[in-house]
Amino acid sequence: MIKIGQINSLEVIKKADFGVFLDGDDYGSVLLPNKHVPEGTELGDHIEVFLYFDSESQLAATIDKPIAQVGEWGLMKIEGINQTGAFVNWGIKEKDLLIPFSEQRARFTAGQNILVYVYTDKASGRIVGTTKFNKWLDKTPANYEVNEEVDLIIAERSQLGYKAIVNGKHWGMIFPSDVFGKLFIGKKLKGYIKQVREDGKIDLSLQKVGVAKMDDLSSKIIELLEKKGGFLPLNDKSSPEAIFDAFRTSKGTYKKTIGGLYKQGKIVIEKDGIRLA
């Protein structure tokens, strides 16, 4: 069964001068214009296409890859605004994505980059976007373990820190003391559960917490040293940015960890890096 608003692998069932027709199952045949048809395509081949409804409400196919499919979040640029709402570039050249005014948490201006959730409007059947995320998140209590790895999408910034969507289901918060490296709205990254409070709110960390944090980083450092021939140009004098790029951890945690490895006799700390002992 094909899925509108998502990428599907469809069979070529007919060729024409202006393109090929794909098997759209219950929707019948779907035209893929020549500009989207891969060279050498033959009958019976399967092509990965994104399916959506065009401006005339006809089912259309494209090989363009959307920034976000139905059920996903993505950072998108506002291309224009009219009396209907804001239109964003979601990666499909033939048609921008509409965010109706009723689905906007704030009024936007052209040129802004905003985080958008893509969904299918049940009343009209159209694929649209929203910046009102609460109704798409799970309201049931979260069941996470401390130090459990999760997928994060940075959604908002406030005085408290960064609000993030956890595994596409729950809200979580990264407090300033747990922020290192560059974070921005729409960034997708791995994180860890710091704690789930009694009121259900989730505190997040970008690295494991407690003893597990140090043990995990120690293993990563030794593993990378072995891969790099026993030397890494990163020591306790290296920049926080360089350390984060290599290990996604803070400089403070890195310094403590290599200090521990040094005391254990596993590494030697040199003026320009660290070396396996």
Predicted feature locations:
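Single-stranded RNA-binding regions, centering on S1/OB-family and related RNA-binding modules
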Residues: 1-277
